[in-house]
UniProtKB/Swiss-Prot annotation:
Intervals, Cytoplasmic compartment: 49-63, 126-134, 182-211, 271-300, 355-357, 401-431
GO molecular function, one term: ammonium channel activity
Protein name: Ammonium transporter 3
Transmembrane segments: 28-48, 64-84, 103-125, 135-155, 161-181, 212-232, 250-270, 301-321, 334-354, 358-378, 380-400
Keywords assigned: Ammonia transport, Cell membrane, Cytoplasmic vesicle, Endosome, Membrane, Transmembrane, Transmembrane helix, Transport
Origin species: Dictyostelium discoideum
GO biological process, one term: ammonium transmembrane transport
Topological type in the membrane: Multi-pass membrane protein
Pfam families hit by this protein: Ammonium_transp
NCBIfam families: amt
Protein role: Ammonium transporter that mediates the import of ammonium in prespore cells. Controls ammonium homeostasis during growth and development. Ammonium has been shown to function as a morphogen at multiple steps during the development. May function as an ammonia sensor that relays information concerning ammonia concentrations to the signaling pathway involved in the slug versus culmination choice and regulates prestalk gene expression.
Highest taxon in the source lineage: Eukaryota
Assigned GO CC terms: endosome membrane; perinuclear region of cytoplasm; phagocytic vesicle membrane; plasma membrane
Length: 431
């Protein structure tokens, strides 16, 4: 993000506060932040549709709590660890706690929305069996200890991965890999939902969500919001950022559409029908797949990236369920962890020469543009370190909660549904 523009709202000096350019860029960032925040509604509808009716209230409350707690914790500490300007180092930012001596509020807004998105994605993988207070504590851990450090390494101009030359325009690693691996750790330690696997054969059994209508609505909200989420990472619409921000929107459109069509086609080949739920996930996988590269590639490359992203999603989803017995009700691990990895790697192949970073720091293009493998190595290092950091810390957290019996709800609560047991009754009332 900072790597894209040296004139971002975070680095603007006071002399430009009253310029037209400053107002236009700030307005752009605020509008984009609003769209990124609106992704919470998209994930809420998507996840509500993917869980069973008896857990609808639970999943919606989870998203509201995640967003609210993330706002407070990111305001107090999280943003400081990511972008604090008082004696920062290559490992972590420092200073500006509680936004003291910090006036780049538009930049804070979009960064908070990104952090909240990473937390919401992760907790979806643990739906229908995680205790509510564990959601709350995990949100604090994710927003204070996990997400800000990776964001600092990759997006801050002081970060050490930034100095190595990593390229992650809109968060393939910072958001999606972090969210995917933390959700996977939680889901793995929770274990599968009751009835997810046949007790005799061990084969997975279908536990379908209760509303494809909510899923479809959520998917369309996410697709719409993705334009603010990705194009907003340009941090402005003036000078040299106008064309890249526009190209980002085209790239995201093509990669998402290709991911959807690819997964629908695979489903027709293997299952004999077009699977709406898988198609929705393919759409999101396609969107995720272009997140790191969308500012640096040609539109034709977006189709290839979305196509491969759809394939990666389909087979990783199957392998996680059938080989690892990982019960992820919303498939967020396959979509975001594997999609985020592919997103980060794809930059090293398809990035065009001269677009990577800002005009003052030109890096070689991707392998297909004669750039060699130097960028690929940097991308792989960033991918591995994001997985290790987020996986290690979240693993310790969930293991500790499990050790003290505070991770999973009891059997009776799970069978009755979290809505009836913990939230005052069903989300649906029929006279």
């Amino acid at each position: 993000m900072e790597q894209f523009s040296t004139s971002s709202s975070e680095s603007s000096d006071s002399s430009s506060e009253y310029s037209l350019e400053f107002y236009m860029d700030t307005s752009w960032v605020l509008d984009a932040a609003n769209l990124v925040f609106f992704m919470q509604a998209g994930f809420g509808m998507l996840e509500a549709g993917m869980v069973r009716a008896k857990n609808t209230k639970s999943i919606l409350l989870k998203n509201l709590i995640n967003t609210a707690i993330c706002a407070i914790s990111y305001y107090c500490v999280g943003h400081s660890f990511a972008y604090g300007k008082v004696n920062p180092n290559s490992f972590v930012g420092f200073g500006n706690f509680f936004l003291m001596d910090y006036t780049h509020y538009a930049y804070w807004m979009i960064q908070w929305a990104y952090a909240a998105t990473a937390t919401t994605i992760a907790t979806g993988a643990m739906a229908e069996r995680l205790q509510l207070h564990c959601y709350i504590l995990f949100t604090l851990v994710q927003t204070i200890l996990i997400y800000p450090f990776v964001a600092h390494w990759i997006w801050s101009q002081n970060g050490w991965l930034f100095d190595l030359g990593i390229v992650d325009f809109a968060g393939g690693a910072v958001i999606h890999i972090v969210a995917g691996i933390t959700g996977a750790c939680g889901s793995f330690l929770l274990g599968p939902r009751i009835g997810r696997f046949n007790q005799e054969s061990g084969k997975p059994k279908n536990l379908p969500g209760h509303s494809v209508v909510l899923m479809s609505l959520g998917a369309m909200i996410l697709w719409y919001s993705w334009y603010g989420y990705t194009a907003g990472a340009s941090l402005g619409m003036t000078r040299s950022r106008v064309l890249p921000a526009s190209r980002v929107s085209v790239v995201v459109t093509l990669s998402g559409a290709t991911g959807l069509i690819t997964v629908l086609g695979i489903g027709k080949i293997f299952n004999g029908h077009y699977d709406l739920v898988k198609g929705i996930n393919g759409l999101i996988a396609g969107l995720v797949s272009s997140t790191s590269s969308c500012a640096y590639i040609e539109p034709w490359a977006a189709i290839i990236i979305g196509f491969i992203g759809g394939i990666v999603y389909w087979f990783s989803s199957w392998a996680l369920l059938n080989w690892l017995r990982l019960d992820d009700p919303v498939d967020s691990t396959a979509i975001h962890l594997f999609g985020g990895c592919w997103s980060l790697i794809s930059v090293a192949f398809f990035a065009t020469h001269g677009r990577v970073r800002n005009p003052d720091i030109i890096l070689p293009g991707g392998i297909f543009y004669g750039g060699g493998i130097s960028l690929l190595w940097v991308q792989l290092v960033g991918m591995v370190l994001a997985i290790l950091w987020a996986g290690f810390l979240s693993g310790i957290f969930f293991f500790t909660m499990d050790y003290f019996g505070k991770l999973r709800v009891d059997v009776d609560t799970e069978l009755a549904g979290l809505d009836n047991s913990n939230h005052g009754g069903s989300a649906y009332i029929f006279d």
